[in-house]
């Protein structure tokens, strides 16, 4: 009987060690994202956006962005964007021709002054978007509104 109690006690002590999450596991609960959303809305810069990196895993990263006006169009030749809209609303302008296209710091990274043509997709909380590499895109936000989203960036395979 004493041996059984000792085995059970030892099992209860050791079990949590084996049940621990992987060191790269991340979970952002809805309440935490709402708190971060509110904080970002108070830190909007001259470009009408604020952002933070939620996690960087080397080959991919999670960003959290808040915009209260149109963003500049961008294009990533080697990076795929996946977007999870957290709050607000806006429009994704996808494709078309990037006007005043300029290379930025990274290889295959470009920004422009606007997009001509392409398609427009209304966005709202809960929407999920996959933006392929090489496709120019911009997030548009009506005056007095905002859009906040989780952005996952990873290399095109």
Please provide the spans of the model-predicted regions.
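Conserved metal-binding segment of the jelly-roll/cupin
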Residues: 122-142
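Bacterial N-terminal signal peptides
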Residues: 6-16
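Short, conserved beta-strand element in jelly-roll/cupin
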Residues: 77-97, 104-114
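A short hydrophobic beta-strand segment most commonly corresponding to one strand
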Residues: 144-157
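His/acidic/aromatic-lined binding-pocket segments of jelly-roll/cupin-type domains
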Residues: 74, 81-84, 120-121, 128-129
